[in-house]
Regions:
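Extracytoplasmic gate region of multi-pass secondary transporters
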Residues: 20-72, 162-166
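Helix-to-loop junctions at the C-terminal end of transmembrane segments
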Residues: 74-87
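Cytoplasmic membrane-interface "Motif A"-like loop-to-helix N-cap segments
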Residues: 84-96
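A membrane-interface helix-boundary motif in multi-pass transporters
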Residues: 88, 174-191
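C-terminal ends and interior cores of transmembrane alpha-helices
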Residues: 97-111
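Hydrophobic core of transmembrane alpha-helices in multi-pass small-molecule transporters
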Residues: 115-129
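Intracellular juxtamembrane helix-capping segments at the cytosolic ends
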Residues: 129-142
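A late C-terminal transmembrane helix in Major Facilitator Superfamily
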Residues: 139-175
Length: 215
């Protein structure tokens, strides 16, 4: 790359070409469920617990702790899963399914006390352990001269999407439309998963991709 007359690490290159921009957006959108789970379900688990089963003792800080311990385990395991399946997309799909199942349990009648809530938050955390693979997939969408820039900016774009999710969850659904907490959480989750699933479908498989090229 140093010997070639190509621009290196230029963030604006993601927006100067339609095909490259679409790849960049898809790489961001496949990671949205992570921050819906962490930023809304787990971070506000004390609010959900109070509405769902009347708890005033649940500590959202403990929910976050259990979730991040499980995320660490998921981050390690997803790499082995993708290696075994010889596919990044199949590994990501498995964790997407786990995420949907965990969210279903979160909103189900089974979530009826603090101990169960903590366990479900841990399961939600584990299911979002695809963070490592989603970042890897995003970086591998691009040539050598943009790969590091993609790997560092894509996760930050996903983190930055949380205020947009809160615009739906809190500002629009609850404050403007007067929806209850549970209904707002479920519909926000459905919208996020639908967007990510469409992006996933159109995202290129990178497991066997030759990465020796530049943009």
């Amino acid at each position: 790359v140093k010997e070639q007359s190509v621009r290196r690490g230029n963030f604006l290159m993601f927006f100067s070409n339609g095909y490259r921009f679409r790849k960049y957006m898809k790489a961001i959108l496949i990671g949205l469920p992570t921050w819906f789970v962490i930023g809304i379900l787990i971070n506000q688990s004390d609010r959900f617990a109070k509405v769902m089963y009347g708890s005033t003792t649940l500590d959202s800080g403990r929910s976050i702790m259990f979730a991040y311990v499980a995320i660490s385990i998921g981050d390690i395991l997803v790499g082995f899963v993708c290696q075994w399946l010889k596919s990044r997309k199949k590994g990501l799909l498995i964790f997407y399914i786990l995420c949907v199942v965990s969210a279903f349990l979160f909103f189900s009648p089974l979530n009826s006390n603090d101990s169960v809530m903590y366990a479900i938050c841990a399961l939600l955390g584990f299911s979002t352990g695809f963070w490592a693979i989603f970042v890897t997939m995003g970086a591998e969408q691009f040539g050598t001269n943009l790969r590091a820039t993609a790997a560092t900016t894509i996760p930050n774009m996903v983190r930055g999407s949380l205020p947009l999710m809160n615009l739906l969850f809190l500002t629009l659904f609850q404050k403007s439309w007067g929806w209850p907490l549970i209904k707002s959480g479920i519909l926000t989750g459905i919208i996020v998963m639908l967007i990510s699933s469409v992006a996933y479908y159109y995202t290129e498989e990178t497991y066997h991709k030759d990465l020796n090229y530049t943009e």
